[in-house]
From Swiss-Prot:
Organism this protein belongs to: Desulfotalea psychrophila (strain LSv54 / DSM 12343)
MF terms in GO: aminoacyl-tRNA deacylase activity; ATP binding; proline-tRNA ligase activity
Record's protein name: Proline--tRNA ligase
Location in or out of the cell: Cytoplasm
Family: Belongs to the class-II aminoacyl-tRNA synthetase family. ProS type 1 subfamily.
InterPro entries for the chain: aa-tRNA-synt_IIb, aa-tRNA-synth_II, aa-tRNA-synth_II/BPL/LPL, Anticodon-bd, Anticodon-bd_dom_sf, Pro-tRNA-ligase_IIa, Pro-tRNA-synth_IIa_bac-type, Pro-tRNA-Synthase_IIa_type1
Gene that specifies this protein: proS
Amino acid sequence: MRYSQSFIPTKKETPAEAEVASHQLMLRAGFMRKLSSGVYSYLPYGLAAIRKVENIVREEMNRAGAQEMLMPMVQPADLWKETGRYEKYGPELLRFFDRNNRESCLGPTHEEVITDIVRNELSSYRDLPINLYQIQTKFRDEIRPRFGLMRGREFVMKDAYSFDVDDEQANLSYDKMFEAYKRIFTRCGLQFRPVQADSGAIGGSHSHEFMVLAKTGEDTIVVCKDCEYAANMEKAEVKLVATENDEALAELEKIETPGKRKVNAVCDFLQITPQQLVKTMVFEADGEAVAVLVRGDREVEEVKLKNLLGVADVELMDDKAVFDATGVPTGYLGPVAIPIRVVADQEVMVMKNFYVGGNEKNFHLKNVNIERDCTVSAVADLRQISTDDPCPRCGGRLELTEGIEVGHVFKLGTGYSESMNARFQDGTGDEKPFVMGCYGIGVSRVVAAAIEQNHDKDGIIFPVPLAPYTVTVLNLGLKDPEITAAAEKLYAELQAAGLSVLLDDRDERPGAKFKDADLLGIPYRLTVGKGLAKNGMVEVRRRRDGHTEEMTPEVAADFLARCIQAELTD
């Protein structure tokens, strides 16, 4: 492509609205333009990058035996009501009525639609297994869209759905997709980790997220320094370290703590550590107030709590709501004779003679012991992981790092097929529900994540597999017939070698051409300028590390073709 004929509207200044590097650089490099909050138009250069990801995804999905199809973005509400998700999904699901007063929604996922298709078309175990996928625009009405394509309302997604006869076969389908995802993100040139994850609104028994490692990632992930264990914060397990504690149970004692409400203030006043104190935090769970006990230096992981209670959502109650539910001001609440349900983190159950709120203003209790003094309805791992906690798998040290979720795979089981009465006949003639899995990749988010992981102060540094153009040829002598002829010849030879090439034939200063080449992140720059007349050489520069070589035009095309092919097959 000739730059003079291309629509790549670059910007010198960083737009004020852009907070993270990928958003800033995508706007500056002419990838996209904002239409409304969280909604963008993809310009040719940005769309080319998205198409590169799509092609890799498509090749690997087909290689894994999945078949591509396309489903409508608008979905009838009745399908979602069959599974109960129409009410559960929340305001992120955009709902509307058509002129005939039929209720519909814009699909953020397509479990209901694909299950409806399969229940009407497949009826025998002989039809299975099957895996169907699409690459399509989705819409999710995010409350606070931000970071460009990282958290937009409209996005490009690949979603696949597998149907199997039993759990054993469904596990094989899941494993096949898991391996396909590893190949996809490896081919995209990304540093990533698969992590154990909570299934969230999609549902199911088991899932993994694929996280691109980046400092600007919105998600915190937990990884072991000594083994392959990795999980997101919501799913990360805490290994309870067994400790011998022969301490005798001391007598319960009420102590005055005037005006001391916060953990640190109480600890300073009583000259104890937070590890000797248990916090009582009150959450609303489907309209019920539930007290949660965690050690004084810990925080509650809300997803773990939600899963324990079996509710759709939990929310920490404010001071007034806590007082209305318990009659105790926040900061002095404790689990002894509390009038609401109590659940406890497993760590609390092995503590002895600890401190809690006294359920009376300005008082705490000393020498509390769970089994003697409290009524606890359930115990589970409810706390957030901390750096250097022991790994639940090998006992090594855990560390926290940031990541960007680009893919998610789920074992759905029979939840959707049973609620929608989607069944097949097995080999004995019995009717059974399909065992399902679903598998998503945020295609447009992959591009943003790649930029977050690959950029510098001058612009994007595209991995070769995702670059809209792998080579840019800079003609620095438009008025010099020899330079122009050499640039044109190289442009033609590189294209003939199967490379995607941008010929910068604009009437611009050399400095402007260099800056745009760096901003756009094109992996290789081939400069044809004064060096050609001086010593018969052109300059080849690698964007990633700035490595530069001079060579003859005859050598340059073959050299670049070999370099790029090597990076595509690494």
